[in-house]
Amino acid sequence: IVRDTIRLEEQAAQKSVISVERDDHVYRMGVIDLPTFYVDFDGRSSGKTDYRSTTRDVARLVKELQAENTDGLIIDLRGNGGGALTEATTLTGLFIEQGPIVQVKNAKGRIEIKRDSDPTIVYRGTLAVLVDGNSASASEIFAGAIQDYGRGIVIGEPTYGKGTVQNLVDLDRYARNKDEKLGQLKFTIAQFFRINGDSTQHRGVVPDILLPTARDD
């Protein structure tokens, strides 16, 4: 339990404030570094009212940054390989009124639209999303939705290009011998599409503002 708590703490969203000088004016920008999309599934399923999640933590940090009179907000998804799909949906909901966030198509061709149904907007100010080639999966859902809604500017490199949904099966429970370790099996169960119909698979999200990288040299 202690180890899991420490791990969640290490992956949790963190805030900072940076100063940017432009046209003889110094702007104070709030930055939220988000290493992964996480949720305390055990806490939520057990009925804990204060369970941790990406959306809950970011909402709290945004309010703290607003109290510090920041001029804008940057969500840093660089290196964020994804995580809980539901958190990508609810996190987007902090910045839009309500509406579809992502389309999920299963192996039978059935399409399910994941929506934000909460009209509450936590932050209405200037918004930028930083991405790189390691921003994948849930990161691409969030960045793509922010871009499609015109809610903020996506800055950085084209993202990883992972537009599929995987499921993880623990094979140990099928072992004949309880001491036998068979590991886990991950397999693709669905593909997701942006609300504009585009797939991010092998394409990624192309930023509104492209920044040069070391790979470009």
Listing of model-derived features with the role each one plays in the protein:
Residues 1-176, 191:
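Cleft-lining beta-strand/loop regions that shape enzyme active-site pockets
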Residues 195, 199-217:
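Conserved functional hotspot residues or short segments at active or partner-binding sites
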Residues 179-191:
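Short acidic, Pro/Gly- and aromatic-enriched capping/linker segments at domain boundaries
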